[in-house]
């Protein structure tokens, strides 16, 4: 996990570029290699010297070998524009259709204003939402609720590489059937790792 990875650009006037500051600190230690698992964006990889990124599709493959039966999945869901590139790679790797979603967030409050499902889902099936980080989980909870209400999706799973789960899992399980994380930050018997 790369701290401050989501701060890959200043969000407001007078913000520091926190990711750049952190990467400068790591670079000052002169490591011969720095390995990141599923970096939030290419910005973090570019700011670190001698950096290797293990991509999300490789990490997810480790779970599909042991825990997650990818043959049970009918759709890969990209929860926002930032996840499309990685989700596309996963959809292509497992030969599944990609469904792209779009959220609008109020930068001042962090709350999601809107959620739209951009691609049609015409047949019932099981969906896997994929992303790099889950902090509190509101994004995924709102998306899962929209998918269940507005599409014929019958079951929803969530895969995140870095599962912070700062608000626990109870709210997520209101709308999500299975949760998978490569690096969970909490212990919970309902979590698949």
Question: Where are these predicted regions, by residue range?
Answer:
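PRPP-associated nucleotide enzymes
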Residues: 1-193
């Amino acid at each position: 996990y790369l701290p401050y990875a989501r701060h890959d650009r200043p969000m407001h006037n007078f913000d520091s570029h926190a990711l750049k500051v952190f990467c400068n600190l790591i670079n000052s230690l002169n490591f011969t290699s720095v390995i990141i698992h599923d970096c939030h964006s290419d910005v973090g990889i570019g700011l670190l010297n001698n950096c290797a990124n293990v991509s999300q599709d490789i990490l997810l493959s480790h779970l599909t070998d042991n825990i997650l039966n990818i043959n049970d999945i009918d759709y890969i869901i990209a929860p926002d524009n930032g996840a499309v590139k990685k989700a596309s790679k996963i959809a292509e790797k497992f030969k599944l259709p990609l469904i792209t979603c779009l959220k609008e967030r109020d930068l001042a409050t962090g709350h999601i204003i809107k959620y739209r499902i951009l691609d049609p889902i015409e047949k019932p099936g099981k969906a896997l939402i994929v992303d790099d980080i889950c902090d509190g989980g509101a994004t995924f909870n709102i998306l899962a609720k929209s998918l269940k209400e507005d599409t014929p999706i019958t079951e929803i799973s969530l895969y995140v590489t870095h599962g912070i789960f700062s608000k626990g899992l109870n709210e997520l399980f209101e709308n999500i059937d299975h949760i998978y994380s490569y690096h969970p930050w909490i212990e919970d018997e309902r979590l698949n790792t």
